[in-house]
């Protein structure tokens, strides 16, 4: 990809899954990469897996002060942040009628408020510097209806509209896009689905499989590169054809 060598990239939720694969991909492209994650064991594991990292920083993204401190530390480690991969998120599989106020608040706080905190702090930094790219992890859950994830779905739809609004306000200095993966075989997915459930999902996807985290990472790398210099305000699905069929593919 053109223009990624030497870019300073901060990946949130970067200790596992899509985040870890994305951190690895940017390192392959010659970027300087810092990973943000709240999980201490995860941060230690990713440091061992990717020794070329510029560093790791800790933060609960739902806490504004922690986000500010972590972003400042990432800037200290790398000198600046040119690209933000705003990826941290959680999900809970539960029936809509049984969602507690505490569960609702937790998912909203991490997946939407946390994305806003990180995006706003990074955007101020980038506007001051005159350029930057913010890429956010949405989901096909924010595009199609899915049962048992009402709170998660609401946050991902929110991320999509936040992305569009940011792109309009931050242009021309800062580009903002979202990536909306479909089913991705990540540790979070494995924890929530049995083997039988995973296979049932595969049969609903036209390509008959889950995405690999590395495939999502490749799209992030492209969108951050000079090859995508005219891309902003867009949501890019990578879902094996899932949304092409709408309800028919569910």
Predicted regions and their residues:
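C-terminal helical subdomain
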Residues: 178, 199-227, 231, 238-240
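Residue(s) in the substrate-gating loop at a strand-loop-helix junction
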Residues: 139
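Short C-terminal tail/terminal secondary-structure segment
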Residues: 144, 232-250
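Substrate-binding pocket helix/loop in short-chain dehydrogenase/reductase
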Residues: 95-96, 103-108, 134, 201
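Active-site loop immediately N-terminal to the catalytic Tyr-X3-Lys motif
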Residues: 97, 144-150, 208, 226
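Alpha-helical segment proximal to the catalytic Tyr-Lys
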Residues: 124, 167-172, 229
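Active-site helix of classical SDR
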Residues: 119, 155, 163
């Amino acid at each position: 990809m053109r223009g990624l060598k030497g870019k300073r990239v901060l990946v949130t939720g970067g200790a596992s899954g899509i985040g870890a694969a994305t951190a690895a991909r940017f390192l392959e492209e010659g970027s300087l990469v810092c990973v943000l994650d709240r999980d201490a064991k995860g941060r230690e594991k990713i440091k061992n897996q990717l020794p070329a990292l510029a560093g790791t920083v800790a933060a609960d993204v739902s806490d504004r002060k922690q986000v500010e401190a972590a972003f400042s530390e990432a800037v200290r480690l790398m000198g600046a942040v040119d690209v933000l991969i705003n990826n941290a998120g959680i999900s809970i599989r539960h029936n809509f009628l049984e969602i507690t106020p505490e569960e609702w608040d937790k998912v909203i706080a991490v997946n939407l408020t946390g994305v806003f905190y990180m995006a706003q702090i990074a955007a101020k930094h980038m506007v001051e510097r005159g350029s930057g790219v913010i890429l956010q992890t949405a989901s096909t859950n924010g595009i199609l209806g899915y049962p048992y994830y009402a709170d998660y779905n609401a946050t991902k739809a929110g991320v999509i509209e936040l992305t569009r609004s940011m792109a309009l306000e931050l242009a021309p200095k800062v580009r903002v896009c979202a990536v909306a993966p479909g089913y991705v075989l990540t540790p979070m997915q494995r924890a929530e689905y049995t083997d039988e459930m995973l296979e049932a999902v595969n049969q609903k996807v036209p390509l008959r499989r889950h995405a690999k985290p590395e495939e999502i990472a490749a799209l992030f790398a492209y969108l951050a590169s000079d090859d995508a210099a005219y891309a902003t305000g867009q949501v890019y699905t990578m879902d094996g054809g899932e949304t092409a069929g709408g309800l028919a593919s569910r």
